[in-house]
Amino acid sequence: MIKGIQITESSNNNLVNSFWLLDEEKNEARCIAAKGDVYQEDQVIAINELGQIAYREIPVNIAPTIKVEGGQHLNVNVLRRETLEDAIKNPEKYPQLTIRVSGYAVRFNSLTPEQQRDVITRTFTESL
């Protein structure tokens, strides 16, 4: 469990009135705020490095955070390969053909020929 403290007494003047988060399970102290430049904000040290101190507890409200790394992205285009290839050859037949590219809706005919081929290649594969 994490406990918030304000150090009220210490032989080290740089610690007096500083604020820390103590994680007793990890035996770590994280500096929240301190005078001078000995302890930096967000610096983590072992709790015993604080030495003999007196402190008062500070209420800490820790909300769990969701951390997403990587993630997934999906564009859904409900089309046949033949439709897109025909749209390349006969753009006048498909003036309203709209597809999804990187989360945006875009008219297929407004893409460059290279982009159109890229969409077809990425959308239609032989296997996963």
UniProtKB/Swiss-Prot annotation:
Annotated Gene3D superfamilies: 3.20.70.20
GO molecular function: formate C-acetyltransferase activity
GO cellular component, one term: cytosol
Residues modified to Glycine radical: G103
SUPFAM superfamilies per the UniProt record, alphabetical: PFL-like glycyl radical enzymes
Source domain of life: Bacteria
Swiss-Prot/TrEMBL keywords: Organic radical
Domain (Glycine radical) ranges: 5-128
Function: Acts as a radical domain for damaged PFL and possibly other radical proteins.
Entry-linked PANTHER family: FORMATE ACETYLTRANSFERASE, FORMATE ACETYLTRANSFERASE 1
UniProt-recorded name of the protein: Autonomous glycyl radical cofactor
